[in-house]
Design a protein with these regions (language model features):
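Short alpha-helical segments enriched in small residues
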Residues: 1-168
Length: 168
């Protein structure tokens, strides 16, 4: 296994999902598939990680993840509302127990009037167990994407019932 600074968080997410018999799917915009890559680095992840959608384009968010176009027009794609709709969409699409999404501005330019480093992570779970985290990150494009993945994995572990957040 390749060791990265993010591997422990991905391993913790896989372990938490395995311990509860839950599954996960990802909907990524600004992270461009990095979160999926981290999950699949972990041995045994195929038991709990169903797959993901990289919905970089707005039309894919609407057409594949079923994000309402009216929501995009009202709040934009860089918003808590869009992040939560993406998480629900990937959960419905795959049948996963949990859907996690990432959207935001990795840079180098602002988007929708939002500063570089503006990030939203959402988790959609069973019985309305949803969470949205807003972050204001500093760094270059790659570091913002990496940090977003780390935080998304932390959110997954923190919101699985009976699991300790770990690696806080």
């Amino acid at each position: 296994m390749r060791h990265t600074t993010r591997a422990p968080r991905a391993a913790a997410a896989v372990a938490a999902l395995q311990a509860t018999g839950a599954t996960l799917a990802t909907a990524e915009s600004l992270t461009g598939g990095r979160l999926a890559a981290l999950m699949t680095e972990i041995p045994g992840s195929s038991e709990v990680y169903l797959g993901g959608v990289v919905s970089y384009a707005t039309d894919l968010k609407v057409e594949v993840l079923d994000v309402p176009r009216a929501l995009v027009e009202q709040y934009g794609v860089v918003s808590a509302e869009c992040a939560l709709a993406m998480a629900h969409g990937v959960r419905r699409l795959t049948g996963a127990t949990y859907g996690v999404s990432t959207t935001g501005v990795a840079g180098p330019d602002r988007q929708e009037g939002k500063q570089v480093g503006t990030v939203y992570i959402a988790l959609a779970g069973p019985d309305g167990r949803d969470a949205v985290v807003a972050l204001e990150l500093v760094g270059d494009r790659g570091s913002i994407q990496d940090r977003t993945c780390e935080e998304a994995l932390r959110v997954v572990v923190a919101h699985i019932p009976g699991e300790e957040p770990g690696l806080g």
